[in-house]
């Protein structure tokens, strides 16, 4: 593509669409459901920061989607912090799980806009397809056994703490000066 304008021009290189590899057709039966786009965005926004960058344990470099009849739980951990985001707003009514690579999660969360209403998700044991707006994003999942995050979080915790947000933020800023 040659783009010409008043003070010069730019030449962009491109590749014809038919030279890109086609999506592999799986022989497995694919699970398919639709969820609100804002639910996926909130789940990814709340978990992406805690994903591990250590490739020694590749399963920890992704976001674990734990899908149940009554909710979808997004989980990530870098082994120092564990984040669990549970959304019960519109459960798909099935039981499944997969680990989405963090790069794909960051791409999807950056592409979701307020105009996107729903995301259609279809997947098998190896890969997933996420369709919303004018985007079709295909990815291979990270394979392995994600650690049981439920064992780390106490079921019946008798302690409950409510703190003023501004007070807590101020204290964290002061302590941050002395942390490494």
Regions found by a protein language model. Give the residues of each.
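Structural preference for solvent-exposed beta-strand-turn elements
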Residues: 1-180
